[in-house]
Amino acid sequence: MASDRQNLQDAFLNHVRKTKVPVTIFLINGVKLQGVITWFDNFCVLLRRDGQSQLVYKHAISTIMPAQPISLYEGEDAN
């Protein structure tokens, strides 16, 4: 069933959240935010840095770039 499958956005955000990979978030107005994603839902992302949390609305996000390469694929051919 299609509803049982996780979409790419959720898989990506969940992976960087669980592994605590630092990310850089670029907003559509050009602002650059850096930190660790601690929580997310359909509408927003909670970003933590230096003990402070920022609630960032997804509609304002242009790009999320992890600080290191990540692999979402867990099959035999994963590199």
From Swiss-Prot:
Taxonomic superkingdom: Bacteria
A GO cellular component entry from the record: cytosol
Record-linked InterPro entries: Hfq, LSM_dom_sf, Sm
Record key words, sorted: RNA-binding, Stress response
Pfam families, sorted: Hfq
RNA-binding recorded as keyword: yes
MF terms in GO: RNA binding
Biological process, per Gene Ontology: regulation of DNA-templated transcription; regulation of RNA stability; regulation of translation, ncRNA-mediated
Domain spans labelled Sm: 10-70
Family indicated by similarity: Belongs to the Hfq family.
Quaternary organization: Homohexamer.
NCBIfam families the UniProt entry points to: Hfq, PRK00395.1
Role played: RNA chaperone that binds small regulatory RNA (sRNAs) and mRNAs to facilitate mRNA translational regulation in response to envelope stress, environmental stress and changes in metabolite concentrations. Also binds with high specificity to tRNAs.
Name of the molecule in the record: RNA-binding protein Hfq
